[in-house]
From Swiss-Prot:
This is Septation ring formation regulator EzrA. It is a single-pass membrane protein. Negative regulator of FtsZ ring formation; modulates the frequency and position of FtsZ ring formation. Inhibits FtsZ ring formation at polar sites. Interacts either with FtsZ or with one of its binding partners to promote depolymerization. It comes from the Bacteria. Residues 1-4 are extracellular.
Amino acid sequence: MVLYIILAIIVIILIAVGVLFYLRSNKRQIIEKAIERKNEIETLPFDQNLAQLFKLNLKGETKTKYDAMKKDTVESTNKYLAPVEEKIHNAEALLDKFSFNASQSEIDDANELMDSYEQSYQQQLEDVNEIIALYKDNDELYDKCKVDYREMKRDVLANRHQFGEAASLLETEIEKFEPRLEQYEVLKADGNYVQAHNHIAALNEQMKQLRSYMEEIPELIRETQKELPGQFQDLKYGCRDLKVEGYDLDHVKVDSTLQSLKTELSFVEPLISRLELEEANDKLANINDKLDDMYDLIEHEVKAKNDVEETKDIITDNLFKAKDMNYTLQTEIEYVRENYYINESDAQSVRQFENEIQSLISVYDDILKEMSKSAVRYSEVQDNLQYLEDHVTVINDKQEKLQNHLIQLREDEAEAEDNLLRVQSKKEEVYRRLLASNLTSVPERFIIMKNEIDHEVRDVNEQFSERPIHVKQLKDKVSKIVIQMNTFEDEANDVLVNAVYAEKLIQYGNRYRKDYSNVDKSLNEAERLFKNNRYKRAIEIAEQALESVEPGVTKHIEEEVIKQ
C-alpha cells in the first residue's frame, strides 16, 4: 500500500514537472517574439526621414523643427528602445526560475515600450511629410500668384478702357503684389516655411479678390454708363407715349424720380474708381428696385385699362338687368300681394334695391365721364368698377332669390291643392273599403278619424277661398292633413287584414268544434270578440285553439291571407 502511495506521488511530481517545462516552453516563444520585434523596430529609418529635410533650406523654422525632431528621436531611443533589452533579459532570467507571472510582466513592459517607440516614429514621419507637403503647396501657390500677377498686369494694360477711372488704382494695387512675392522668396530662403505659407496664402486670396473686381468692374461700368441711362430714356419716352394715349401717370412721378435716380447714379462711378464695389452694387440695386417699382405702377395702369375695357360692357348689362328685374318685381309684388300674404320686408327690400340701383347707375355715369377725359387713371377706374360689379352682383342675387320666392308661392299653392284633392280621394276610397269589408260594423275610431279629416279639409278649403292666402301656413296644414290621412289608411289596412285573418281562423276551426269542446268554446269567444270589433284578441284566442289541435296551421293561414 505504501509502495502505491509513493508511486502515485512520484507520478504527480513528474506530471507537475512536465507541466512546468511545457509552460516555460510557451513563455519562451513569447520572449522570442519580443526579441524579433525589437530587432525589427531597431531598423526603423528615423535618420532617413530626417535626411529628407536636408533637401530643403535647413534654416529658420525648418532648422528649428529639424533639431526638435532629432532631439525627439534621441529621447525616444533612450526612453523607449534602450530599456527593452534589459526587460527581455530579466524576463529570461525569471523564466529560468519558473517565475511565469513576473516574466510575463517584464515582457508586457517591453511591448509597451516598443509601442511607444513605434508611435514616436509615426509622429516623426507625419511631421516630415507635413513639412515637405507645405513646401510643395507653397511653391504651387507662389507659381500661381506669379502667373496671376503677370496676367492681371497685362489685362489692365491691354483693356484699360474697360476699367475706366479704376484702371490707375488697379495698376497700383497690382504693383503692390511684386514686393510681396519677393518677400515670400526671402521667407522661403530663410527656411521659415510656416510664415511663407501664411504669407503666400494671404497674397493668393487678395489676388483672387482683385481678379474678381477686374471681372466685375466692366459689368458695373457698362450698367452705369449705358444700361441704366438707356432705361431712364426708354421709361421717359414710354411714359410720354402713354400719356398721349390717355393714361394719367402723375402718381408715378416719372420726371422727378428719374432725376433723383440720375443723381444717385452719378455717385456710382466714383465708388467704382475707388474699388468700393460693395457700396456701388448697393446703390445700383437700390436704383434698379426703384425702376422696378415705377415699371410695376405703369404695368398696373396698362393692365387696368385692359380690364376696364373687358368689364365695362358686363357691368352695363348687369345694371340694366338689375333695373329691369327690379321693375318686374315691383309690378309682380303688387299683383301677388292681392292673392298671397307677403312679408312687408320683401316689399321694402325691392324699394331699397331700386334706390341702390339708381345710386350705382349714377356712380357708373360719373365713371364714364371720368373715362371720357384726356387723361385717365385706369387703376382708380378699375377699383370703382370692381366696387360696382360686386354690389350689382349682390343685388341681382337677392332680387333673383325674391323672384323665385314669388314664383314658389304659386307653385306651393298648386301643390297644396293637389295634395288636398288626393287626400279627399284616398279618404273616400279607404272608407268604402271599410264599408265593403267583412267587418260587422265600421269601428267608431275610424268614423272619428274620417270626420276629423273632413273637418280639416273643409277648413283648408275655406282658407283657399280667402285672399290673400298665407301660403306657408296653408302648406303646413295640408302637410298635417296628409299625415292624418296616412295614419287613417295604415290603421284601416291593419284592421281589414286582421278581420280577414280572424274570419279565416274561425272558419277553419269549425271542423274541430264537434270533436274538441275546448276548441268550440274558444271559437265562440273569438266570434264574440269579432262582433265587437276586437279582431286582434279574437286572432289570439283562435290561434291558440287551432295550434292545440293542428300545430303550424295558423302560419299557413296567415300566409294565404297576406298573399290575397
